[in-house]
A protein has these predicted regions:
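A conserved regulatory-domain signal marking ACT and ACT-like small-molecule sensing domains
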Residues: 1-91
Length: 91
């Protein structure tokens, strides 16, 4: 069995309709799968962390990040492989 690969997505910005839907659409179009989502809306501010299964992704993680940014140009989007995320937080 192949090892599952995950990526960690962070989205921050002014709250508006369709942020979660835009991200989920981009992930599905790239053949990714949403594993877990945590989001908080504080007044006008939106924050979301998402764990995405990218094992069978069509394209690269960078291409998925670009697709999300194109769908949601008014929010900050950061996507990184969980190996990088784990390494950053284990030092």
């Amino acid at each position: 069995m192949d090892k599952k690969e995950n990526a960690v997505l962070t989205v921050v910005g002014k709250n508006e309709i369709g942020i979660l839907a835009g991200v989920a659409t981009a992930v599905a179009e790239a053949n990714g799968s949403v594993v877990q989502v945590s989001q908080i809306v504080m007044e006008d501010f939106f924050t979301m962390n998402m764990l995405i299964d990218v094992t069978d992704l069509n394209g690269t993680i960078h291409e998925l990040e670009t697709s999300i940014k194109e769908k949601l140009p008014r929010v900050e989007v950061h996507l990184m492989h969980d190996n990088i995320f784990s390494a950053m937080h284990s030092i």
